[in-house]
């Protein structure tokens, strides 16, 4: 049976950790002849990003419920009912063969609307600890997928990894030059940057450069460029440091790096595994349910990463870890291989095949 003419409604939004894995699946299915439509919210990143990939997007009015004030929580049930009706209208008009929920505000109402409309619902959870929306929807979904083992305890879920871009998967097979060159450290704190990295790294580089040759590519986040550049200059380290507000080409950044200092978002952890890079992971301390620490454990337990909680992070600890890696390039290479060994490289295809199978069953 041909897949041409099949339709999928993709629900993902809010953060890159939801949107980019969903885009990988959407692109794959579009190449198979599927019609793809997106459900999101107008004030989040999907509104800008999804149309750039050529996909139509519909918006519903919904805000996060968790962690808000009392008045918003009291109003939440009415907002949820309204958004379910909006999502149901989109489903009635588009008539998808399957609905794929990958997180974000729109997934909850959209998932309920899919169930009410009798359309197969596939869920994918990117984090090691599921979000509230996916916990609830997992009870009504046709199929539950997850990136990491032991994510769901109340329902049966299939572990498929996190869908990531093909270009990054190919990058993992390239040899790394780790001989006597300067240690190349990629520092990534997300689109907003990470203040703790911005504050500490100028001192870290100054201390390390007295003993080691080191170069740094540092993504500092929006509005932080001038301040961090100045801090490096004050430490006399502006020569070997490339400071950027945002790194658009992560493929180039990963190809360049020997080691990555970063948060432990689900997509980041999966990308580090796929490209085969050692890492120093500092989980975002305010993440819901501390899910970034659980994400990080996948690489830490494999011997592919060091875990440094932000509460104990300081200049000396970062210098110590980077010094260790700079002095033992063989271990650096082994850590990279261990990262690659835990990667799930066909996650996009696995998620897509589940959607295809459910659509064909009707």
Curated annotation (Swiss-Prot):
Belongs to the glycosyltransferase 28 family. MurG subfamily. InterPro entries: GlcNAc_MurG, Glyco_trans_28_C, GlycoTrans_28_N. Coiled coil: none annotated. It is a peripheral membrane protein. UDP-N-acetyl-alpha-D-glucosamine binds at residues 15-17, 127, 165, 191, 247, 266-271, 292. SUPFAM superfamilies: UDP-Glycosyltransferase/glycogen phosphorylase. Pathway: Cell wall biogenesis; peptidoglycan biosynthesis. The keyword Glycosyltransferase applies. It is an enzyme of class 2 (transferase). This is UDP-N-acetylglucosamine--N-acetylmuramyl-(pentapeptide) pyrophosphoryl-undecaprenol N-acetylglucosamine transferase. Gene3D superfamilies: Glycogen Phosphorylase B (3.40.50.2000). Its main location: membrane. One of its GO terms (molecular function) is UDP-N-acetyl-D-glucosamine:N-acetylmuramoyl-L-alanyl-D-glutamyl-meso-2,6-diaminopimelyl-D-alanyl-D-alanine-diphosphoundecaprenol 4-beta-N-acetylglucosaminlytransferase activity. GO terms for biological process: carbohydrate metabolic process; cell division; cell wall organization; lipid glycosylation; peptidoglycan biosynthetic process; regulation of cell shape. The lineage of its organism: Bacteria, Pseudomonadati, Pseudomonadota, Gammaproteobacteria, Alteromonadales. Keywords: Cell cycle, Cell division, Cell inner membrane, Cell membrane, Cell shape, Cell wall biogenesis/degradation, Glycosyltransferase, Membrane, Peptidoglycan synthesis, Transferase. It comes from Shewanella oneidensis (strain ATCC 700550 / JCM 31522 / CIP 106686 / LMG 19005 / NCIMB 14063 / MR-1). The gene is murG.
């Amino acid at each position: 049976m041909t897949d041409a003419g099949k339709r999928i409604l993709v629900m993902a939004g809010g953060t890159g950790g939801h949107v980019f894995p969903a885009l990988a699946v959407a692109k794959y299915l579009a190449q198979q002849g599927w019609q793809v439509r997106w459900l999101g919210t107008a004030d989040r990143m999907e509104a800008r990003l999804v149309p750039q990939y050529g996909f139509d997007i519909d918006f519903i009015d919904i805000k996060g419920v968790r962690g808000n004030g009392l008045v918003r929580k009291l109003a939440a049930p009415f907002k949820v009912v309204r958004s379910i009706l909006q999502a149901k209208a989109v489903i009635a008009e588009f008539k998808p063969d399957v609905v794929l929920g990958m997180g974000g505000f729109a997934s909850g109402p959209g998932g309920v609307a899919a169930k009410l409309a009798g359309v197969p619902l596939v869920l994918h959870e990117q984090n090691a600890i599921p979000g509230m929306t996916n916990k609830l929807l997992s009870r009504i979904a046709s199929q539950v997928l997850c990136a990491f083992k032991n994510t769901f305890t109340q329902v049966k879920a299939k572990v498929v990894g996190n869908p990531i871009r093909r270009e990054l998967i190919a990058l993992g097979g390239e040899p790394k030059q780790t001989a006597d060159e300067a240690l190349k450290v990629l520092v990534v704190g997300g689109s907003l940057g990470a203040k703790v990295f911005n504050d500490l790294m100028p001192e870290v580089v100054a201390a390390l450069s007295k003993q080691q040759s080191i170069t740094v590519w540092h993504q500092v986040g929006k509005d932080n460029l001038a301040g961090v550049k100045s801090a490096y200059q004050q430490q006399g380290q502006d020569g070997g440091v490339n400071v950027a507000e945002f790194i658009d080409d992560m493929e180039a950044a990963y190809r360049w790096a020997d080691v990555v200092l970063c948060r432990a978002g689900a997509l980041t952890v999966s990308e580090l595994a796929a490209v085969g890079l050692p890492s120093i992971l500092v989980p975002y301390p305010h993440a819901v349910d501390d899910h970034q620490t659980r994400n990080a454990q996948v690489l830490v337990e494999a011997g592919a990463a060091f875990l440094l909680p932000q509460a104990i992070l300081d200049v000396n600890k970062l210098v110590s870890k980077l010094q260790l890696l700079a002095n033992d390039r063989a271990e650096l290479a082994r850590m990279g291989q261990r990262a690659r060994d835990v990667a799930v490289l066909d996650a996009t295809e696995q998620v897509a095949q589940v959607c295809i199978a459910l659509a064909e069953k009707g």
